[in-house]
Amino acid sequence: MPSTAASQLVAAKGGSFLVENRTPTEVFTPEDLSEEQRQMAATVAQFARDEILPAAEEIEEKKPGVLAALMRKAAELGFASVDIPEEYGGLGMDKTTSTLITDHLSVLASFSTAFGAHIGIATLPLVWYGSEEQKQRYLPKLASGEWLGAYGLSEASSGSDAMNIRTRATLSADGTTYTLNGEKMWITNCGIAGLYTVFAKIDGEKFSAFLIERDTPGLTVGAEEHKLGIRGSSTCPLVLQDCKVPAGNLLGEPGKGHHIAFNVLNVGRFKLGVACIGGARHALAHTIEYAKQRKAFGKAIAEFGLIQRKIAQGATQLYAAESMAYRTVGMIDASLEQLGDHASRSSREIQKCIEEYAVECSILKVYGSEMLTVVADELIATMGGYGYVEEYPAERFYRDARINRIFEGTNEINRLIITGWLMKRALSGDLPLLGAIKTLMDEVTQPPSLDGSVDMGEALARESELLAALKKIALFAAGVASQRFMAALQEQQEVMADLADIITQVFALESALLRARKLGRSGKHSAKVAADMTGLLADESVAMAEQAAKRVLAACGEGDMLRTQLAILRRLARFTPADSVGLSRAVARECIQAGKYPLQ
């Protein structure tokens, strides 16, 4: 369990970061890991170094058996068992440990994609919704790696629109067998899996899930796809032609498959964001290593300011993503702690604790995947022509990064989820967002005054002040959009996406700031670089939010009203910038000296 006392950590409501303030002791950070968790992280990292990276070329070339054997080896070490209860062959550990495994295994996207699918979307539906007989039969095999898992939801005509699947299931007259017909597309692990969780509509109407073994009559695995990235992972179509599935292999209740599909996606999105953090950390180390070795104009290019800016930008965004990820899993574990010990927790209760943080999961997915894209792109920029050559890892990082903005719901869909989910909770009264918006709207129509919400004598006071302003920008933009469009706001996708980006910057900056303040109180050397990265992030977050808010306001009004609203926005977003050149150089120096991400 986390070393920070459970009584200090707060299981805050999902999305409450917009309307509530937290203290550093109330949030979990990577520095709070217990000794047991650190040992697990070290074991996983060693496996990644000693087993995954040496096999990278063979995995990418799809050498038969290599990927599956390595996944089974990881499972033998317990990496596939953390989220599976002990009574079914698992370890039943906390979600922070599960997060660490995903984080530190993610040095090769082909492997992390395959293993992540196995331990996540292919296993958790069974853990949460399986009958006792189903769990006893399948979970020990999945935990040990004897069988690998795959998850079949997407179809050629229904990607993001998951409820529009065409695969049909028909129950036999005697009620013993379902016959499935349809085709699933882009199924990760399809070619190596022993068990498939497949979604179909019973009688063309009831959206349901089924557990299908590989040797089931009527199930055919199609040819491997030749992909832009994650080339070493198995991705195939799954064809169901009069596929006979025992009625006992229906997962959950008939017509309730959407609960399974959507709830497991929350974990999938969170874990994908975490995997992007691990991948970015590895890519940033390559950037730093090359920059230190490459000489130009008589010195290492790591000494040049523009290269240092690239390194600092990558480290700063990585720091923000990492802070969000461990803060989120800390809230999940704090919520689970309230349920009592592992044995007393029902699968439904665990699922509800995770579902509470659906918006944070979507935020991390979007931010993490786009952060990795930046880091991979700057690795190629740093390496120049070498970055385009397959002999070097940069081009693989670049190719592999793109899929993360598509997986687990595209980033466009997740942006709509972020804003839509918060508005839904606001309207239901689960989140006091509407009251906060009203208070802010009343405030901004009055002459400006100091609200006293920030103690300017505290550490990182400037960044705290910018965070307060950022929250006001988010509430102001959301309030204007809500008044303009009301219930029709969901139809304004561009506005929804811009609001999501502002909200994301709030969560990113607050998570980074709280972590930096917590480190500052510890007296550790790393506190300085954390503070510098938070300073860089604060300026960038407010600037990005202001631009997004301008687009929202312009879509909502015109003339004098728009000019008045823009004046209010300028007042909210007004700040004295930090010396970003100096901060970037300071952050880059720490990275270059460490030869890697400085908080690693």
Where are these regions (language model features)?
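Amphipathic, small/basic residue-rich leader segments at the start of a protein or domain
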Residues: 1-116, 133-144, 333, 337-351, ...
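Glycine-rich phosphate/cofactor-binding loops in nucleotide/flavin-utilizing enzymes
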Residues: 2-26, 100, 375, 385-460, ...
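Glycine-rich beta->alpha junctions and the first turn(s) of the following alpha-helix
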Residues: 3-4, 30-33, 39-40, 220-322, ...
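C-terminal helix-coil-helix/basic helical segment that borders enzyme active sites and/or dimer interfaces
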Residues: 56-61, 319-367, 380-381, 486, ...
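N-terminal glycine-rich flavin-associated loop
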Residues: 114-133, 159-162, 171-174
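A short, Trp-centered hydrophobic/proline-enriched beta-strand micro-motif
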Residues: 145-153
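A short core secondary-structure module
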Residues: 176-221
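C-terminal amphipathic alpha-helical interaction region
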Residues: 445-453, 458-600
